[in-house]
């Protein structure tokens, strides 16, 4: 971790930190700095893992296109089936939220039916009671 920093440099940094921060705040400062370093390492590792995964996916796509260009007619049925499964998996990853045409035509949840009983209003009676 400290490739270019020797023991004397670390000792000097520790003494300066002790003088500047004091013995009460130095352990807290060291803990917060190590927490930041851990968070940065975690973030860098997650970015690296995502990039590696994307590169693997791109390599699979390139291999699939290369196999298609060489001709799929000469392949065995098992290999053809696995390529078809790979294509389906790639399409499902690329478009996970795409709906089928059959799902668009038929709603999954039916709207509630309105069963409101109509009551006749007696507007003439209310006006006559208020007026007289």
Swiss-Prot record:
<feature type="compositionally biased region" description="Polar residues">
    <location>
        <begin position="86"/>
        <end position="95"/>
    </location>
</feature>
<keyword id="KW-0997">Cell inner membrane</keyword>
<dbReference type="GO" id="GO:0043953">
    <property type="term" value="P:protein transport by the Tat complex"/>
</dbReference>
<dbReference type="GO" id="GO:0008320">
    <property type="term" value="F:protein transmembrane transporter activity"/>
</dbReference>
<protein>
    <recommendedName>
        <fullName>Sec-independent protein translocase protein TatB</fullName>
    </recommendedName>
</protein>
<dbReference type="InterPro" id="IPR018448">
    <property type="entry name" value="TatB"/>
</dbReference>
<comment type="subunit">
    <text>The Tat system comprises two distinct complexes: a TatABC complex, containing multiple copies of TatA, TatB and TatC subunits, and a separate TatA complex, containing only TatA subunits. Substrates initially bind to the TatABC complex, which probably triggers association of the separate TatA complex to form the active translocon.</text>
</comment>
<feature type="transmembrane region" description="Helical">
    <location>
        <begin position="2"/>
        <end position="22"/>
    </location>
</feature>
<keyword id="KW-0472">Membrane</keyword>
<keyword id="KW-0813">Transport</keyword>
<keyword id="KW-0812">Transmembrane</keyword>
<keyword id="KW-0811">Translocation</keyword>
<keyword id="KW-0653">Protein transport</keyword>
<dbReference type="InterPro" id="IPR003369">
    <property type="entry name" value="TatA/B/E"/>
</dbReference>
<comment type="similarity">
    <text>Belongs to the TatB family.</text>
</comment>
<comment type="function">
    <text>Part of the twin-arginine translocation (Tat) system that transports large folded proteins containing a characteristic twin-arginine motif in their signal peptide across membranes. Together with TatC, TatB is part of a receptor directly interacting with Tat signal peptides. TatB may form an oligomeric binding site that transiently accommodates folded Tat precursor proteins before their translocation.</text>
</comment>
<keyword id="KW-1133">Transmembrane helix</keyword>
<dbReference type="Pfam" id="PF02416">
    <property type="entry name" value="TatA_B_E"/>
</dbReference>
<feature type="region of interest" description="Disordered">
    <location>
        <begin position="86"/>
        <end position="132"/>
    </location>
</feature>
<dbReference type="GO" id="GO:0033281">
    <property type="term" value="C:TAT protein transport complex"/>
</dbReference>
<keyword id="KW-1003">Cell membrane</keyword>
<feature type="compositionally biased region" description="Polar residues">
    <location>
        <begin position="116"/>
        <end position="132"/>
    </location>
</feature>
């Amino acid at each position: 971790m400290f490739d270019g920093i020797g023991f004397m440099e670390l000792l000097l940094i520790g003494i300066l930190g002790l003088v500047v921060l004091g013995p009460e705040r130095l352990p807290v400062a060291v803990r917060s700095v190590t927490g930041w370093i851990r968070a940065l390492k975690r973030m860098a590792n997650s970015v690296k893992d995502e990039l590696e995964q994307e590169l693997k996916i791109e390599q699979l796509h390139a291999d699939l296109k290369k196999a298609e260009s060489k001709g799929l007619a000469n392949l065995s049925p098992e290999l053809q089936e696995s390529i078809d499964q790979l294509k389906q998996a790639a399409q499902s990853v690329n478009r996970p939220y795409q709906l089928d045409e059959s799902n668009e035509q038929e709603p999954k949840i039916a709207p509630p039916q309105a069963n409101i009983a109509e009551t006749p209003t007696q507007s003439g009676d209310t006006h006559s009671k208020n007026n007289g």
